[in-house]
């Protein structure tokens, strides 16, 4: 590979340094490279590998199959290997198989995993394993029940291992039913059956039912959506976008997989745990299954994309076969309709997302690129910023901004090409089938009025939703901050005879609602935050849905809600001497005087 950068890091220096590191590599990295060195070798149609990990303490059905191999002398017709966890009791293995045992760390073990036509395993597979085309991977489970396999546990390789399975045997009917019928596992692995000893009554039945089992393609009835969450930088913002996307999918038509690093703390884990129950979660663990030379080439590019002089040329040097082998390790052979990337910059995760086979690849760019550019104060940081923008446009079909302004300034400053940029507003329902158009949604089953669009400095756009009282009831609103609490509640309690609801506006609204429990009307009170309604450019349209405005006490200060209700011709109600009546006094004599005041004090209430 030619040198691609003008900085001190040359490819030859990098390669020499990395070769030394890889020579001393241990654990999964070492085994993954050994496996990768053998990955291109052809499958041996007469090789059978039994893989028992340290977790397979009682895998009776798998052991019975091994015993049957001995009984019918299948070990004389097939090349048999047993990769055996170091912590397992070797007495579990039939004596005739003792001579075939290999330790997972043996070099021969990685070659056998890469070349075996048949791989029979228990609960686990190696983290670096990728099922090759034509390779028959048959799994045996003693139990696989929901209570023992929550989705965070499944995320730790188990889901990927299922995806790389062509057939699954379970020891009990409950597990077979759970894997076959549970929506979380549908369209993942191959066929599932409860293990029956009938299949090992003769040599012919073993060969026909296990060794010569036809590999059936998993049928996909839904469109697959893949979401990448890279390094967590702004947890609140990333969680918001993650929920925005996952809460508004039609899971009758969409199958959603979220892939991410394993959370480093309980807060992030809690975010993931409480996502929509239909979302399948996979933690990327392990390493690239590739040779040492391939690994060095990939790492060189990943670590230097920020400093390359020609990003497009560097991107063209990527060994996409190795990257796609890694995505196959995680997701199997499934094709995705859409790939969505959320989170902070990561060259690795960008490349992974860019190499997944999909119709559409989207990057959610929720930060203000102008600010990001301004914060890049050194020459190296400016190059890194520029290179990242170019890398994103090579890897993704669209860069999605949270508002029109961010999109337009990104195009104007040439951060992003016009044909690569689009935007949506928050919150929305994503319709990936209709040219990335979005529509508003109901929240928790209730209807809300769409309030102001508020742009945060960090790039998010909040679309405020204001509660709408139930149809058929009289609808009132009040400014809770300038009302006498007890008088207001007494007034509203009397109005309950007319079956009404009241929206409370202001910082003290929650306190008043708590007090309302004494009057038994707390369920008829709805709340709006002061900031949200004050900043709304849709306030008058919202107020038009109400029948009247209530106030109690001294309301001498300006109230934009009352002013809006007056100008809309709505009734203003007061209570005097225990009697509720209309108030004919006006805060503004006409609309013009209100507009003049409004323009002068715009920032105070909008």
Which residues fall in each region the model found?
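Conserved donor-binding/catalytic core segment of Leloir-type glycosyltransferases
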Residues: 45-54, 201, 222-231, 400, ...
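A conserved nucleotide-sugar
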Residues: 73-82, 252-257, 470, 489-528
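Nucleotide-activated donor-binding/catalytic signature segment of Leloir-type glycosyltransferases, i.e.
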Residues: 94-102, 275-283, 450, 512-533
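Conserved nucleotide-sugar donor-binding subdomain of glycosyltransferases
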Residues: 103, 151-156, 162, 298-347
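Active-site proximal beta-strand in glycosyltransferases
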Residues: 132-149, 353-372, 400
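Membrane-proximal helix-turn-helix segments that form the acceptor-binding/catalytic region
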Residues: 151-167, 326-331, 379-399, 544
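A short, active-site helix/loop in glycosyltransferases that binds the activated sugar's phosphate group
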Residues: 168-186, 395-420, 428-456
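Aromatic "clamp/platform" in nucleotide-sugar-dependent glycosyltransferases that forms part
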Residues: 554
């Amino acid at each position: 590979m030619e040198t691609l950068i003008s900085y001190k890091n040359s490819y030859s220096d990098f390669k020499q340094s990395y070769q030394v590191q890889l020579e001393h590599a241990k654990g999964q990295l070492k085994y993954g490279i050994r496996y990768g060195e053998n990955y291109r070798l052809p499958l041996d149609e007469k090789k059978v590998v039994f893989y028992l990990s340290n977790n397979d303490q009682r895998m009776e059905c798998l052991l019975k199959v091994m015993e049957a191999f001995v009984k019918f002398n299948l070990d004389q017709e097939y090349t048999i290997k047993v990769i055996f966890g170091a912590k397992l009791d070797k007495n579990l293995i039939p004596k005739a198989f003792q001579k075939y045992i290999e330790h997972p760390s043996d070099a021969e073990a990685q070659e056998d995993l890469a070349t075996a036509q048949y791989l029979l395993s228990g609960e686990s597979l190696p983290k670096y394993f990728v099922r090759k085309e034509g390779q028959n991977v048959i799994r045996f489970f003693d139990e696989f029940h929901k209570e023992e396999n929550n989705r965070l546990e499944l995320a730790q390789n188990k889901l990927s291992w299922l995806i790389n399975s062509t057939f699954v045997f379970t020891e009990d009917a409950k597990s077979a039913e759970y894997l076959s019928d549970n929506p979380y596992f549908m369209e993942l692995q191959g066929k599932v059956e409860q293990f029956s000893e009938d299949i090992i009554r003769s040599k012919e039945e073993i060969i026909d039912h296990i060794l010569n089992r036809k590999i059936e393609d998993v049928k996909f009835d839904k469109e697959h959506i893949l979401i990448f969450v890279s390094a967590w930088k702004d947890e609140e913002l990333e969680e918001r976008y993650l929920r925005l996307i996952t809460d508004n999918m039609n899971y009758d038509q969409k199958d959603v997989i979220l892939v991410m690093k394993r959370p480093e703390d309980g807060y992030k884990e809690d975010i993931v745990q409480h996502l929509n129950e239909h979302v399948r979660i996979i933690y990327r663990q392990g390493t690239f299954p590739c040779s040492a030379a391939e690994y060095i080439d990939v790492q060189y590019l990943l670590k230097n994309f920020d400093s390359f002089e020609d990003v497009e040329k560097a991107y063209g040097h990527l060994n996409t076969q190795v990257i796609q082998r890694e995505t196959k390790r995680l997701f199997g052979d499934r094709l995705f309709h859409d790939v969505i990337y959320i989170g902070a910059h990561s060259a690795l995760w960008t490349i992974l997302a860019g190499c997944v086979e999909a119709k559409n690849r989207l990057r959610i760019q929720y930060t203000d690129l102008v600010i990001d550019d301004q914060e890049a104060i050194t020459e190296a940081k400016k190059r890194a910023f520029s290179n990242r923008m170019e890398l994103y446009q090579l890897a993704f079909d669209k860069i999605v901004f949270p508002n029109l302004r961010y999109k337009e300034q990104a195009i104007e400053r040439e951060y992003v090409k016009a044909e690569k940029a689009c935007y949506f507003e928050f919150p929305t329902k994503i319709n990936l089938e209709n040219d990335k158009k979005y529509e508003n949604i109901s929240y928790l089953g209730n209807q809300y009025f769409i309030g102001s669009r508020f742009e945060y400095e960090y790039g998010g756009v909040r679309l405020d939703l204001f509660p709408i009282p139930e149809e058929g009831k009289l609808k009132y609103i009040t400014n809770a901050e300038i009302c006498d609490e007890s008088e207001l509640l007494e007034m509203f309690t009397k109005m309950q005879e007319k079956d009404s609801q009241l929206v409370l506006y202001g910082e003290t609204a929650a306190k008043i609602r708590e007090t309302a429990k004494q009057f038994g009307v707390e369920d008829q009170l709805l709340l709006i935050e002061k900031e949200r309604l004050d900043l709304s450019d849709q306030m008058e349209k919202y107020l038009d849905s109400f029948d009247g405005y209530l106030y109690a006490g001294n309301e001498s200060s300006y109230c934009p809600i009352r002013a809006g209700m007056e100008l809309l011709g709505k009734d203003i109600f007061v209570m005097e001497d225990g009697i509720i009546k209309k108030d004919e006094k006006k805060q503004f004599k006409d609309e013009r005087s209100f507009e003049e005041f409004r323009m002068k004090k715009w920032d105070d209430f909008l």
